[in-house]
Amino acid sequence: MAAGRLRILFLLLLSLHLGLGWVLDLQEAPAADELSSGKMAETGRTWKPHQGNNNVRLPRALPGLCRLWSLTLPVAELGLGYASEEKIIFRYCAGSCPQEVRTQHSLVLARLRGQGRAHGRPCCQPTSYADVTFLDDHHHWQQLPQLSAAACGCGG
């Protein structure tokens, strides 16, 4: 436990020293497996870029491209009717999709959009899913198949 806290403190100090301006957020952030320690997900702690206004000039960030994000939620907040005090990590996809995706489908779709015959833009969506398992209030294991996104990509 102390080693985990020390690692978090080290990462925080290093990021501030490098001018990255990252802070710890307990609600919404990029998936924890993007960090060096996968144990962040177990505690519900994830990282996201600092958005406050302090005197540190932040480096210009890349546009928010399609990627995996995570939220730590109580099972009851899923709205699926399960009674449980457990918290789960719900992963989802969000971000923008570049127009340069080069598949036959995307090339034809881009041409049709240019002619006004097709609508919409490529969207960020899960390319694979993961099952989520939790213990309900009656001490029974519940498995929710394909509840959480496992990988993201641009489609459409």
UniProtKB/Swiss-Prot annotation:
Q: In which tissues is it expressed?
A: Expressed at low levels in substantia nigra. Cochlea.
| One Gene Ontology term of the molecular function aspect | growth factor activity
Gene Ontology biological-process annotations: branching involved in ureteric bud morphogenesis; glial cell-derived neurotrophic factor receptor signaling pathway; peripheral nervous system development
GO CC, one annotated term: extracellular space
Q: Which SUPFAM superfamilies match?
A: Cystine-knot cytokines (SSF57501)
Q: Where in the cell is it found?
A: Secreted
List S-S links within the chain: C66-C124, C93-C152, C97-C154
Give the range the annotation lists for the signal sequence. Answer: 1-21
Record note on quaternary structure = Homodimer; disulfide-linked. Interacts with GFRA4 coreceptor and RET: forms a 2:2:2 ternary complex composed of PSPN ligand, GFRA4 and RET receptor.
- Protein family: Belongs to the TGF-beta family. GDNF subfamily.
The function of this protein is: Growth factor that exhibits neurotrophic activity on mesencephalic dopaminergic and motor neurons. Acts by binding to its coreceptor, GFRA4, leading to autophosphorylation and activation of the RET receptor.
The name this protein carries in UniProt is: Persephin
State the organism named in the record.
Rattus norvegicus
